[in-house]
Protein backbone atom coordinates (compact mmCIF):
# COMPACT_ATOMS: atom_id res chain seq x y z
CA UNK A 1 0.00 0.00 0.00
CA UNK A 2 2.88 2.35 0.77
CA UNK A 3 4.37 1.72 -2.68
CA UNK A 4 1.05 2.62 -4.33
CA UNK A 5 0.96 5.91 -2.41
CA UNK A 6 4.53 6.67 -3.49
CA UNK A 7 3.59 5.90 -7.10
CA UNK A 8 0.59 8.23 -6.96
CA UNK A 9 2.68 10.96 -5.36
CA UNK A 10 5.30 10.54 -8.08
CA UNK A 11 2.67 10.86 -10.82
CA UNK A 12 1.21 13.99 -9.21
CA UNK A 13 4.66 15.54 -8.91
CA UNK A 14 5.55 14.56 -12.48
CA UNK A 15 2.32 16.12 -13.77
CA UNK A 16 3.04 19.27 -11.74
CA UNK A 17 6.53 19.54 -13.25
CA UNK A 18 5.28 18.96 -16.81
CA UNK A 19 2.58 21.62 -16.40
CA UNK A 20 5.14 23.94 -14.80
CA UNK A 21 7.46 23.59 -17.79
CA UNK A 22 4.59 24.18 -20.22
CA UNK A 23 3.59 27.33 -18.30
CA UNK A 24 7.17 28.63 -18.20
CA UNK A 25 7.71 27.99 -21.90
CA UNK A 26 4.39 29.68 -22.72
CA UNK A 27 5.42 32.79 -20.77
CA UNK A 28 8.82 32.83 -22.47
CA UNK A 29 7.21 32.44 -25.91
CA UNK A 30 4.72 35.20 -25.12
CA UNK A 31 7.63 37.63 -24.61
CA UNK A 32 9.96 36.49 -27.42
CA UNK A 33 8.67 34.83 -30.60
CA UNK A 34 8.83 34.81 -34.39
CA UNK A 35 5.87 35.56 -36.63
CA UNK A 36 6.92 34.57 -40.12
CA UNK A 37 10.31 36.21 -40.54
CA UNK A 38 9.67 38.94 -37.93
CA UNK A 39 11.19 38.55 -34.49
CA UNK A 40 8.99 40.00 -31.73
CA UNK A 41 10.01 40.84 -28.18
CA UNK A 42 8.13 42.21 -25.21
CA UNK A 43 7.69 45.92 -24.67
CA UNK A 44 9.81 46.02 -21.51
CA UNK A 45 12.50 43.63 -22.76
CA UNK A 46 13.31 44.63 -26.34
CA UNK A 47 16.39 46.60 -25.28
CA UNK A 48 17.86 43.57 -23.56
CA UNK A 49 17.21 41.19 -26.45
CA UNK A 50 19.17 43.25 -28.98
CA UNK A 51 22.67 42.42 -27.68
CA UNK A 52 21.68 38.83 -26.86
CA UNK A 53 20.30 38.05 -30.31
CA UNK A 54 23.32 39.69 -31.92
CA UNK A 55 25.64 37.57 -29.80
CA UNK A 56 23.68 34.40 -30.60
CA UNK A 57 23.78 35.18 -34.31
CA UNK A 58 27.53 35.84 -34.07
CA UNK A 59 27.87 32.14 -33.21
CA UNK A 60 25.21 30.72 -35.53
CA UNK A 61 26.06 32.76 -38.66
CA UNK A 62 29.70 33.71 -38.06
CA UNK A 63 32.88 32.53 -36.41
CA UNK A 64 33.03 34.66 -33.25
CA UNK A 65 36.33 33.30 -31.93
CA UNK A 66 38.04 34.80 -30.03
CA UNK A 67 34.68 35.81 -28.65
CA UNK A 68 33.72 39.50 -28.57
CA UNK A 69 30.47 41.38 -28.19
CA UNK A 70 29.12 42.44 -31.61
CA UNK A 71 27.84 45.72 -30.10
CA UNK A 72 31.01 46.53 -28.14
CA UNK A 73 34.12 45.79 -30.16
CA UNK A 74 37.26 44.81 -28.30
CA UNK A 75 35.50 44.13 -25.01
CA UNK A 76 35.91 40.74 -23.36
CA UNK A 77 32.70 38.79 -22.83
CA UNK A 78 31.70 39.19 -19.19
CA UNK A 79 28.51 37.13 -18.79
CA UNK A 80 25.96 34.83 -20.46
CA UNK A 81 28.60 33.29 -22.72
CA UNK A 82 27.43 29.67 -22.44
CA UNK A 83 23.76 30.60 -22.80
CA UNK A 84 24.41 32.60 -25.97
CA UNK A 85 26.87 30.06 -27.34
CA UNK A 86 24.45 27.17 -26.76
CA UNK A 87 21.55 29.09 -28.35
CA UNK A 88 23.82 29.94 -31.29
CA UNK A 89 24.79 26.29 -31.73
CA UNK A 90 21.12 25.24 -31.62
CA UNK A 91 20.28 27.83 -34.27
CA UNK A 92 23.27 26.73 -36.36
CA UNK A 93 21.92 23.16 -36.18
CA UNK A 94 18.56 24.32 -37.56
CA UNK A 95 16.44 25.41 -34.61
CA UNK A 96 14.75 28.82 -34.87
CA UNK A 97 16.41 31.46 -32.69
CA UNK A 98 13.27 32.13 -30.63
CA UNK A 99 12.80 28.44 -29.84
CA UNK A 100 16.48 28.01 -28.95
CA UNK A 101 16.44 31.10 -26.72
CA UNK A 102 13.14 30.21 -25.04
CA UNK A 103 13.97 26.54 -24.60
CA UNK A 104 17.21 27.27 -22.77
CA UNK A 105 15.56 30.00 -20.69
CA UNK A 106 12.59 27.81 -19.80
CA UNK A 107 14.78 24.81 -18.97
CA UNK A 108 16.98 26.94 -16.70
CA UNK A 109 14.05 28.49 -14.83
CA UNK A 110 12.31 25.11 -14.62
CA UNK A 111 15.42 23.46 -13.15
CA UNK A 112 15.69 26.21 -10.53
CA UNK A 113 12.00 25.86 -9.60
CA UNK A 114 12.30 22.08 -9.35
CA UNK A 115 15.21 22.55 -6.93
CA UNK A 116 13.20 25.15 -4.98
CA UNK A 117 10.28 22.71 -4.79
CA UNK A 118 12.41 19.85 -3.50
CA UNK A 119 14.26 22.10 -1.05
CA UNK A 120 10.98 23.35 0.45
CA UNK A 121 9.55 19.83 0.49
CA UNK A 122 12.67 18.39 2.12
CA UNK A 123 12.82 21.22 4.67
CA UNK A 124 9.20 20.91 5.79
CA UNK A 125 8.14 17.43 4.72
CA UNK A 126 5.08 18.78 2.92
CA UNK A 127 4.48 18.64 -0.82
CA UNK A 128 2.09 21.57 -0.52
CA UNK A 129 4.89 23.81 0.77
CA UNK A 130 6.95 22.95 -2.31
CA UNK A 131 4.05 23.83 -4.60
CA UNK A 132 3.34 27.07 -2.71
CA UNK A 133 7.04 28.01 -2.92
CA UNK A 134 6.96 27.62 -6.69
CA UNK A 135 3.73 29.63 -6.99
CA UNK A 136 5.06 32.39 -4.72
CA UNK A 137 8.15 32.69 -6.91
CA UNK A 138 5.93 34.27 -9.57
CA UNK A 139 4.41 36.86 -7.21
CA UNK A 140 7.10 39.57 -7.56
CA UNK A 141 7.42 40.07 -3.79
CA UNK A 142 3.75 40.96 -3.49
CA UNK A 143 0.35 39.36 -3.65
CA UNK A 144 -0.75 41.67 -6.49
CA UNK A 145 -1.15 38.83 -8.98
CA UNK A 146 -3.18 36.76 -6.57
CA UNK A 147 -5.22 39.84 -5.65
CA UNK A 148 -5.97 40.46 -9.34
CA UNK A 149 -7.00 36.81 -9.73
CA UNK A 150 -9.31 36.95 -6.70
CA UNK A 151 -10.89 40.16 -8.01
CA UNK A 152 -11.53 38.47 -11.37
CA UNK A 153 -13.13 35.48 -9.65
CA UNK A 154 -15.36 37.66 -7.46
CA UNK A 155 -16.43 40.05 -10.22
CA UNK A 156 -16.55 37.42 -12.96
CA UNK A 157 -14.63 39.83 -15.22
CA UNK A 158 -12.20 37.38 -16.82
CA UNK A 159 -11.86 39.47 -19.99
CA UNK A 160 -9.98 42.26 -18.19
CA UNK A 161 -7.89 39.69 -16.32
CA UNK A 162 -6.70 37.89 -19.48
CA UNK A 163 -6.33 41.03 -21.60
CA UNK A 164 -4.40 43.06 -19.02
CA UNK A 165 -1.30 44.67 -20.53
CA UNK A 166 -0.35 47.00 -17.68
CA UNK A 167 1.70 46.40 -14.56
CA UNK A 168 -0.37 45.43 -11.58
CA UNK A 169 0.27 45.83 -7.89
CA UNK A 170 2.09 48.21 -5.70
CA UNK A 171 5.69 47.17 -6.30
CA UNK A 172 8.13 49.15 -8.42
CA UNK A 173 8.72 47.86 -11.93
Predicted regions span which residues?
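Membrane-embedded, hydrophobic transmembrane alpha-helices
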Residues: 1-11
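Membrane-proximal intrinsically disordered regions of secretory-pathway and membrane-system proteins
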Residues: 11-18
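Active-site lumenal/periplasmic loops and adjacent helix-entry segments of GT-C-fold
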Residues: 20-173
Amino acid sequence: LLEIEKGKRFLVEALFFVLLFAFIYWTMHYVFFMDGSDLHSGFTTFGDFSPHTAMIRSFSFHNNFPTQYPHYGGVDVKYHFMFQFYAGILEYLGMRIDIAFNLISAASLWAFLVMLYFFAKQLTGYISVGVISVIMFFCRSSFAGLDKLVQAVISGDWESFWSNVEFIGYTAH
